[in-house]
UniProtKB/Swiss-Prot annotation:
GO terms for biological process: isopentenyl diphosphate biosynthetic process, methylerythritol 4-phosphate pathway. The record marks R155, K211 as: Positions MEP for the nucleophilic attack. It comes from Pseudoalteromonas atlantica (strain T6c / ATCC BAA-1087). Pathway: Isoprenoid biosynthesis; isopentenyl diphosphate biosynthesis via DXP pathway; isopentenyl diphosphate from 1-deoxy-D-xylulose 5-phosphate: step 2/6. It is an enzyme of class 2 (transferase). This is 2-C-methyl-D-erythritol 4-phosphate cytidylyltransferase. Belongs to the IspD/TarI cytidylyltransferase family. IspD subfamily. Coiled coil: none annotated.
Length: 231
């Protein structure tokens, strides 16, 4: 009987979360007695195929080292950069002897374990990367700079990109490096792979896998965390 492969997750956590309008970076805000970052890391490590998490932290960060989770043997800290892509690349460059790697947002604490399992299973039958995503359900409008509607976009084949995103390590590291060297804006790892004409598969996941961005998201994330066994 073969053993399931083990993987490392890179978590970029060097951002300051200005939209949250809080007194600290959003990953250090508390939900249900723990910081968002602690929920995120513990949730990832709870999966039996995750063996290590590399957290990219702002070098001037004053919060991470005081968290109990910072001393866990399965957590490795690296210095992050000014942009998400810089932090992800720092995490990737610290990796050795890995074929595949996951990248997950620090502010997504509500990832479902079976969604993560579905994503990891793609490595068993594909040489390409994949991301968790959920289908667009609302009517989508294209607007102009004056906030006037130009037209309605078709929802067919439109998806919300989520994380984790899962790629061969060398392919992702190369794509990020090339895109950054050309000054391309990288909003997620898939966009770097797309830029080098790589193939990325969509794995449907739950819409409850939200990214905490606005103040009202804190209450929604707390609800999902408290009810994750039934969602």
């Amino acid at each position: 009987m073969s053993t399931a492969p083990l993987y490392t997750v890179v978590v970029p956590a060097a951002g300051i979360g200005q939209r949250m309008q809080a007194d600290r970076p959003k990953q250090y805000l508390t939900i249900a007695g723990k910081t968002i970052l602690e929920h995120t890391l513990e949730n990832l490590y709870a999966h039996p195929q995750i063996e290590q998490i590399i957290v990219a932290i702002n070098p001037l960060d004053q919060y991470f080292d005081s968290l109990p989770i910072a001393s866990k043997t399965w957590v490795k800290r690296v210095d992050g950069g000014g942009e998400r892509a810089d932090s992800v690349l720092a995490g990737l460059n610290s990796l050795q002897n890995a074929d595949w790697v996951l990248v997950h947002d620090a502010a997504r604490p509500c990832l479902a374990q079976d969604d993560l399992s579905k994503l990891l299973a793609t490595a068993e039958h594909s040489e390409h990367g994949a991301i968790l995503a959920c289908r667009v359900r609302d009517t989508m409008k294209r607007g102009n700079s004056s906030h006037d509607i130009l037209h309605t976009e078709s929802r067919d084949n439109l998806w919300h990109a989520l994380t984790p995103q899962f790629f061969p390590l060398d392919a992702l590291r190369s794509a990020l490096g090339q895109a950054m060297a050309q000054g391309i804006e990288i909003t997620d790892e898939a966009s770097a792979i797309e830029w080098v004409q790589g193939k990325v598969h969509l794995v449907e996941g739950r819409s409850s896998n939200i990214k905490v961005t606005q103040p009202e998201d804190l209450h929604l994330a707390e609800f999902y965390l408290q009810h994750k066994a039934t969602l």
